[in-house]
Amino acid sequence: MEGLKTPRLLCADEIEARVSQYIEGKGCSVLLYKTARVDMDILDETYGLGAWTNDYKEIKGNLYCGIAVNGIWKWDCGVGSNAEAQKGEASDAFKRAGFRWGIGRELYSSPFIWIPENKFETKVVKGKKVPKDRFIVCNIEYNEKRKISYLQIKNANSQEIVFSYVRA
């Protein structure tokens, strides 16, 4: 888009890591994501306070969020979370609209993240064994195509690097 700045790439401390699947005795896969607060901060930083706005619309039972910069709107649909369905759906729609503006789009280049079970503690919740420890993105770098070229994730409790990736 001519005249509009490209949002900067995400810093390591702006990226959250959450367990997406756990296989007992083997390990867990981890997904990277950004929060809606990160989108708001980057919109403010890139375009200025008051230079952007957002709106929500319900279409066929789905909640859409649009973000406008200089009168140009980009929309996307949200998916509710299990915890707080409406708030989660609104937040998800906002983050997805942020992706449409290029905020955090580099996360789509994330490698598959697998952490072996010997790298984290587990606990039992409702009779089911689950990971107890949290994971943190501690280092991230990007190439000239805005793709992840280097990634390190550490166990927040032990501070041990539990995943490393270098793009060939």
Give each language-model segment a name.
Residues 1-29:
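N-terminal, Lys/Arg- and Ser/Thr-rich interaction peptides
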